[in-house]
Amino acid sequence: MASTSLGASILVSHCSSAPEFQVSGMRLVFGYKAFGCRTSRRGFRVRCESKIQEKELRRCSPFLERLSLPREAALSSNEWKSVPDIWRSSVEKYGDRVAVVDPYHDPPSTFTYRQLEQEILDFVEGLRVVGVKADEKIALFADNSCRWLVADQGIMATGAVNVVRGSRSSVEELLQIYCHSESVALVVDNPEFFNRIAESFSYKAAPKFVILLWGEKSSLVTAGRHTPVYSYNEIKKFGQERRAKFARSNDSGKYEYEYIDPDDIATIMYTSGTTGNPKGVMLTHQNLLHQIRNLSDFVPAEAGERFLSMLPSWHAYERACEYFIFTCGVEQKYTSIRFLKDDLKRYQPHYLISVPLVYETLYSGIQKQISASSPARKFLALTLIKVSLAYTEMKRVYEGLCLTKNQKPPMYIVSLVDWLWARVVAFFLWPLHMLAEKLVHRKIRSSIGITKAGVSGGGSLPMHVDKFFEAIGVNVQNGYGLTETSPVVSARRLRCNVLGSVGHPIKDTEFKIVDHETGTVLPPGSKGIVKVRGPPVMKGYYKNPLATKQVIDDDGWFNTGDMGWITPQHSTGRSRSCGGVIVLEGRAKDTIVLSTGENVEPLEIEEAAMRSNLIQQIVVIGQDQRRLGAIVIPNKEAAEGAAKQKISPVDSEVNELSKETITSMVYEELRKWTSQCSFQVGPVLIVDEPFTIDNGLMTPTMKIRRDKVVDQYKNEIERLYK
C-alpha cells in the first residue's frame, strides 16, 4: 500500500531550450516546431508529464515506537493499541530492572527492560529491511528463550502476524501449518532444526527468507539453496543501521504511518488438542491486551519478583502470562523440565507458571523422598502431614470454602453448629499443625523453592495434589482457559482459593452451563457444557468459517467442549464464600459410553489411580465395551521395590519382574485407589513406552492425547477385550 503526493512543474520549451514552472500537481511542457521547409508556419506543442512521489506505508506500534516517529505521527496518549506497546510503559517504570535471564543458551543472556526494548526495536527495523510487510504471515518455529520473545514482539510490531509452533513438532505438522497459514518467511530456533526441515520446505513451501535465532549459518547443510538465510545478529545489525540513519537524517518523513488496530490479528496459534486436526486460532491484539490488563486481579505480581518459565513460550497460556508479568516489572528466568528441579532451589522464584502435571510430579517426588527415609522419619512425616490435611479441611469448613452442588442453602442453626464444630476441631489440631510446619513443611517448601504461589493452567489439578500443597503451605492457583479464549477466562484468587475449582471468571467475561443435548441453560449446581462470552474469545479459526460457526454462536457464546458447573450462591454454610466459582469435570468428548448405555467420565478414575506410586501414566478406555479397561505405564522402579518386600529372599535375586506380575500388582493398586469411584476398571494393558511430546502421545502442555493413544494400541485393545 502507498499514498501518493503530487509535486509537479510547468516546462516551456522552444526548440532545444525551455523554462520550467513548478505548479502543484503536474509538470506541463510547452514547445513549438517547424512542420516542413516549404512553410514558415510553426506548430505549438504541449506535453503533460506527471511526477509522482511515493510514500511507503509503515504499520507500527505507536506507543512502542513513539520516540522514533515524526512529531505529527506520534501517539499523544499512553493508551496501548497493540501488544508491543507495553514495552514503552515498562521501560518508563522499570527501565534498569532485570527483565529476563536466559542462562541455558549460547551465549547466556540477561536484559534489563531498557535493553530488551532496544533489542525489540532493532529487530523490528531489521525485519522491515529484509522486506517484512504489514499483514504478512511469518512462521515462528522455536522454543522458549529471550530471542523468541524479541522475535515474537518484533513481528507483531511491524503489523505482521506471527504463526507459532515449537521445534519439537513433526516436519509434516510444521509444513501443514506453514502452508495453511500462507506464511511467507520462517524464523527458526537454530541451524540443527532448520537442517531437519529444510528439504521438505524447499520443495513444497520455499520461504522468501529464513532467520536463525541461535547458532551460526556455518552450521547449515543447505548451502547452494536460493533462500536467503540471516542470523539473529544480522537482523539486529540491519535494524541498528536503519535506526541510526533515521536519527541522522529526516528519512522517517518519507513514510506514511499507520497505527496497528487493536482488532488486527496479532498471532495465529494452531491448537494441538487431545483430539482432531489442529486449527488456526486467530487472536487479536485486543484479545491479548485484555489478558494483560486483567490478570493482575488473580496474580498480584510486584516489581522485582522472580518468575520461573518452563512452558513453551508459543503456547497461549505461557504467552499471556509472560506479556502480563512484563507490565509488572518482574524478573523472568527461562528454564526447562531438565533444569526445573535445580532452578527451583537455586532461583527460589516467587511464582512458577506451569501445568498440573508439573505439580503432580513435584508431589510424587516429595512422596518418594519421604518413602526413602528411615521408618521412624517416614512415620512421623506422614502422620504430621495427615494432621495438617485434617486441619486445613476444618479451616475450609469454617471459612466457607467447600464446594457444593446443593442449590438450597442449609438452615442457619445447622450452619452455626457446623461452623462451631470445625472451629473446635481446628483449635485442637492447630498445635500439631504448627509442629508439622516446623519439622516437615518448611523443609518441603525449601526443597520446592516456590516462595509465593504456583500458578497452574491447562487443566484441573487432581484434588489430592491440591489438598497436599495447601496442607504444607504452598499456594497453588488454578486457572482455566483455551487457546480460543486467549486463554485465561477464570482463575482462583489467593484470597478465595477454592480447592477443586478453577475460580471466578475474569473481568467482563460471562459463563453459562447448558444441557449437552438440548442447549437449555442450566441452574447453578447442574453439570453441563461450559460456554464463555467476552473480550478473550478469539476472532475465529483461520480460513475455516464453518468450524468457527460450530463453536461460536450468533450471540458470541463460545462452546468450550468442557463439562462443568457453577457453584450456587449461599449466604450460610460451608460454601458461603465460594458462590459463582467454576468447577470442571472433564471434556465432553472424553466421556466413555459403555455398551450398556452408561456414561463414564474417565478423569475421576485416572486422578484416583495416579495416587498410586506404581502407576506412572494411565488412560481409561472402554468405548462401546461392556466394561472399562485401562492402558497403564507402570513405574517399574517402584514396582520392583514393592515386589521385593513381598517375595522370598531366594526370589529377590530376580532382577526383572514379568509383565504378568506387574499387571497383577497394577490391578491391585487400581482396585485399592479407585474403590470409591463410580466405576471400576476391568482389563489392564501394560505398555513400556511412556506417553511423551516427542512420540506425539502428549500435547505441548503435557496432556495425554487419548485418540492417539487408543489408535496406537488399537490391536492390543481388541485382544484385551476378547
From Swiss-Prot:
Transit peptide boundaries, per UniProt?
1-47
Q: Which InterPro entries match?
A: AMP-bd_C_sf, AMP-binding, AMP-binding_CS, AMP-dep_synth/lig_dom, ANL_N_sf, Chloroplast_AMP-bd_Enzymes
Q: Lipid metabolism: present as a keyword of the record? A: yes
Q: Where, per UniProt, does this protein localize?
A: Plastid, Chloroplast
Identify the enzyme class. Answer: ligase
EC number of this enzyme? 6.2.1.-
Report the superkingdom from the record.
Eukaryota
Source organism per entry reads Arabidopsis thaliana (Mouse-ear cress)
What this protein is called in its record is Probable acyl-activating enzyme 16, chloroplastic
- Signal sequence span is none
- Which keywords accompany this UniProt record? Chloroplast, Fatty acid metabolism, Ligase, Lipid metabolism, Plastid, Transit peptide
